[in-house]
């Protein structure tokens, strides 16, 4: 039994030691390299110096470097806030440049369009001539027709198959500046922008309406602007960063990209607005690669820049644009016909056939593709039906909107058999006809805009074709179609799809064995800070947690210094542009990012302050770690991996830290209040005596109120037995008070019970003993309170006495056990001491004997060696004798 008690005691002691030294507590680290996905607005920087471009973006200083990270991150070009912001912002740029702003509801009227006036310019005869000239027999394909820089038809604008623009002259009456007087106006429309009613052939006029007139969002351009594309880059606000997947195998979606770099800004990109093709992109390389949507067949194909693919468009003619004042503050621009207008057209240069062949080969090698491997069965096709922007290749040239019919180009690139096509499409050419529209469908939002007629003079645009927008479809592995697409937004998924925006989260939580302590008496190793800039501390993102914690102080300083530096740079450029930023959409975004970094830093410090860790790099907390089975591998885990593991615990840990800090503040407050009692002089302070007087008054008032309540209860109990005045004295407490009546006053008539005397003395009851009665009642009350308190204390003592006795007995037993154990230890120690002494004596004796024997042996050996010469001499002497 005693042995069992000893074992139990040892187990309890070991568990206590384990509970003290092995409990892990929450530790807060500030300056760790971790992040999470973010969706805040980015700001734009550009080197373009034209007015509207600099109004929209901040000046670009070109100092943006990338830093490689040893981490794995997921990337998606379609679920990406960077690409979504680019699409929205480029649309804002587009509208700012082209400016459709005046609603055209006054022009939704009936117009009289003169057919003979239109025919006089040959605007309709050419089309009918071409239509009727088609033979009805088996069609014959025309000879391949190509143009280049030296072709004469380029300069003369008379290449084969090009026509005149189909236009119609119309008149309409409207009320002008005078409300009661109408005025007739002339206007020339593109035939595709009008809807006319068919009338008899003898009538030269037709009733026509502007197309899409019932659409409420139709707007006319206030002013004619060029849509010159600009190159710009996106930059993250301070406290945020841009990660980029640097893997050459990245195809728009990669859940585990291991080649990640970080920067504060993206690469330069181009503001492209076109269907089918992407122009002047910045992602072209000496290879062809594909961005493929993760869930459907949408793709954006980057073309190999080795083939030098170009597209050059031209709008010939000498048009004149005149303003027509409809009413005050509303001007509509008309284009009278001064010369025979010619059709716009575009021609394609470079090794297009080789480029498309490489595109097909790249599709076959793509892991998402499961169609035929025969590139001859992969065809480049035009979409069928839909809006004009889908059916035609739509682009913008110097502010004009070109719609190009691409059949000739597709026939040329694919070497198609044109014998089965319609007569007008039966050509294989490297140029295509285009026409200009005033009413276009908006590419970003549902709606239509009306723009000014084309500007005067020749218009020429030269572009480099860098990408191809297409949907790839295949059926049964026999045929694959590369269908050209009108998704303008895909261009920006190619430009910025390898980026993702993240928010730096420098606060990390991890379990350690250290509890909260004060650092007032401790010393710190001073460490020199090597400022890498704001993103420098992310270089340790791929390092283990233990290695990062060593440098967390330097990293937190680097983080703050980088935020302040980046904030100052942004503030400087905003100051330089403040006059131009007042009326722009992006100006508001830029000003918004100006305060983001400081807000983020203050938010982090407020959170640290709520935990009692303000301005500390490593802060130990008294809160135990809530999940003992979840601990970091300090030598292998990175902070980013550890943050993902404990993400589900973060909310719970945060609540525990706040509760612990609140309790800590309460304890400090109570401790400070107790500090005022440690000085004896404070007990006699005037403020203290005022409090004592208040406490005394409270006691007196309480006793009085209690007595009143008791008296009322007693009176109510007496009333149940019979009536007696509440304030009358108890029985037998009466004293007669004699009063002398004035003889001059009339004598009061006798009453019943007066005794028949009308004399001068009378008596009435007075409660003179009532005060004595109250005193006795108060004494009785105090006696009752004293007896009850004494009874309560005696009962408490009686209840606690067995517990105290058992506790005392337990303590005695523990003391006996400890004394027994101590006796055992003392006996064992004495036995051990005696054994050591005996061993020492035995060893000493043994060593002494061994040393004597050894010394004797050495002495004899020495004597024998010393005797050798003497023996030799003696031998020689004997020999000589």
UniProtKB/Swiss-Prot annotation:
Residues 636-668 form a coiled coil. Residues 313-345 are annotated as: V3. Residues 23-696 are extracellular. Keywords: Apoptosis, Cleavage on pair of basic residues, Coiled coil, Disulfide bond, Fusion of virus membrane with host membrane, Glycoprotein, Host cell membrane, Host endosome, Host membrane, Host-virus interaction, Lipoprotein, Membrane, Palmitate, Signal, Transmembrane, Transmembrane helix, Viral attachment to host cell, Viral envelope protein, Viral penetration into host cytoplasm, Virion, Virus entry into host cell. Specific enzymatic cleavages in vivo yield mature proteins. Envelope glycoproteins are synthesized as an inactive precursor that is heavily N-glycosylated and processed likely by host cell furin in the Golgi to yield the mature SU and TM proteins. The cleavage site between SU and TM requires the minimal sequence [KR]-X-[KR]-R. Palmitoylation of the transmembrane protein and of Env polyprotein (prior to its proteolytic cleavage) is essential for their association with host cell membrane lipid rafts. Palmitoylation is therefore required for envelope trafficking to classical lipid rafts, but not for viral replication. Residues 477-484 are annotated as: V5. Residues 1-22 form the signal peptide. A lipid is attached at residue 789 (S-palmitoyl cysteine). This is Envelope glycoprotein gp160. It comes from Simian immunodeficiency virus (isolate K78) (SIV-mac). The gene is env.
